[in-house]
Amino acid sequence: MENFPTEYFLNTTVRLLEYIRYRDSNYTREERIENLHYAYNKAAHHFAQPRQQQLLKVDPKRLQASLQTIVGMVVYSWAKVSKECMADLSIHYTYTLVLDDSKDDPYPTMVNYFDDLQAGREQAHPWWALVNEHFPNVLRHFGPFCSLNLIRSTLDFFEGCWIEQYNFGGFPGSHDYPQFLRRMNGLGHCVGASLWPKEQFNERSLFLEITSAIAQMENWMVWVNDLMSFYKEFDDERDQISLVKNYVVSDEISLHEALEKLTQDTLHSSKQMVAVFSDKDPQVMDTIECFMHGYVTWHLCDRRYRLSEIYEKVKEEKTEDAQKFCKFYEQAANVGAVSPSEWAYPPVAQLANVRSKDVKEVQKPFLSSIELVE
């Protein structure tokens, strides 16, 4: 395995943050913790229900980690929506992360998918059964156009996860394959459409702006995620089917060339995002900018992405990119580095245990280094 290209990664990340004029001021610390706990608490109670526990069959520690990661993503990025919308989106996107980590073969339970859908029968695939049950709670926040995007993008995501189970990076020469798979499993349209709740945005009068935002967000959010995930995925055997690695196989290019391709696409998309909406409806631009800044903060602060390791490695270096990266990282940490012990309680496993014993909800938080993922 070749060495991680630290200098290149620093330069790319710094340019990205400069292009989007990164300055996350979405919340005060108190507001951030309040929203995190509200969304987490509702989502944790949802996943602690016996039906969810029985059908998902997810390791409690992994479910806890997935929930904490997703609540952070939603609260940090969807800064302009209501707390109730944050909570419902947190549940939906936690389901997607659970599916993304699943290794179960979907084929047997998808044979009659459309027949069951048309007849109004419960889906045989347990994930779809649970997601469909929760979907009305999500869609109630949005108009019909945005709702259709959420439904369609979620269906695409399921199919993308199905494809990923084959660990197939594409045939050499199949240049369309990497972006085909990334668009399918990236949830870009779901994310782009879920920024516009109907209580805040009239999707009929802002139809062109919302449509354009969904189109731009599809690539921007997945490319930024791919770029900022590159470090954690670089030498992880479980993360070898990524956009960059698929470019290497399908385009028959080097890893450096593949990373450069992703870099240029991400930077161009960032320029577009700012340029296209800077003179449009101010509320639309504000929502997009808050999302971009919060999304970056989440990546820099969430332990899943391990970017603190890059910071520790380069914080004593005197190069311009190293110093700029560290400044951005510290800026993000000042607003976004919040310990889960301050908001992610009680653990899902404890709530599930309480429910199974038919005991009333525990009032005092119980924090365990085993059950709560720091």
Swiss-Prot record:
One BP term from GO: sesquiterpenoid biosynthetic process
Cofactor binding, note field: Some of the cofactor binding sites show unusual localization within the protein.
A Pfam cross-reference name: TRI5
Effect caused by changing D104E: Does not significantly affect the KM and kcat for farnesyl diphosphate
Reported induction: Expression is positively regulated by the trichothecene cluster-specific transcription activator TRI10. Expression is induced between 18h and 21h growth on GYEP medium. The initial detection of trichothecenes occurs several hours after the initial detection of TRI5. The initiation of trichothecene biosynthesis occurs with a high concentration of glucose remaining in the culture medium.
Activity regulation, free text: Benzyl triethylammonium cation (BTAC) acts as a competitive inhibitor of trichodiene synthase reaction in the presence of pyrophosphate (PPi).
pH dependence: Optimum pH is 6.75-7.75.
UniProt-listed SUPFAM superfamilies: Terpenoid synthases
Result for mutant: R304K: Does not cause large changes in the overall structure but increases the KM for farnesyl diphosphate by about 25-fold, reduces the kcat by about 200-fold, and leads to conversion of farnesyl diphosphate not only to trichodiene but to at least 2 additional C(15)H(24) hydrocarbons
Protein residues bound to Mg(2+) 1: D100, E164
Binding site for Mg(2+) 2: N225, S229, E233
Residues involved in Mg(2+) 3 binding: D239, I241
InterPro entries in the record: Isoprenoid_synthase_dom_sf (IPR008949), TRI5_ascomyc (IPR010458), Trichodiene_synth (IPR024652)
Functional pathway: Sesquiterpene biosynthesis; trichothecene biosynthesis
GO function terms (MF aspect): metal ion binding; trichodiene synthase activity
Region (Aspartate-rich domain) location: 100-104
Result for mutant: D101E: Leads to an increased KM for Mg(2+), a reduction in kcat, as well as to the production of anomalous sesquiterpene products in addition to trichodiene when incubated with farnesyl diphosphate
Catalysed transformations (reactions): (2E,6E)-farnesyl diphosphate = trichodiene + diphosphate
Misc. comment: Trichothecenes are sesquiterpenoid toxins that act by inhibiting protein biosynthesis.
Function according to Swiss-Prot or TrEMBL: Trichodiene synthase; part of the core gene cluster that mediates the biosynthesis of trichothecenes, a very large family of chemically related bicyclic sesquiterpene compounds acting as mycotoxins, including T2-toxin. The biosynthesis of trichothecenes begins with the cyclization of farnesyl diphosphate to trichodiene and is catalyzed by the trichodiene synthase TRI5. Trichodiene undergoes a series of oxygenations catalyzed by the cytochrome P450 monooxygenase TRI4.
Membership in a protein family: Belongs to the trichodiene synthase family.
Descriptive protein name: Trichodiene synthase
Organism of derivation: Fusarium sporotrichioides
Phylogenetic classification of the source organism: Eukaryota, Fungi, Dikarya, Ascomycota, Pezizomycotina
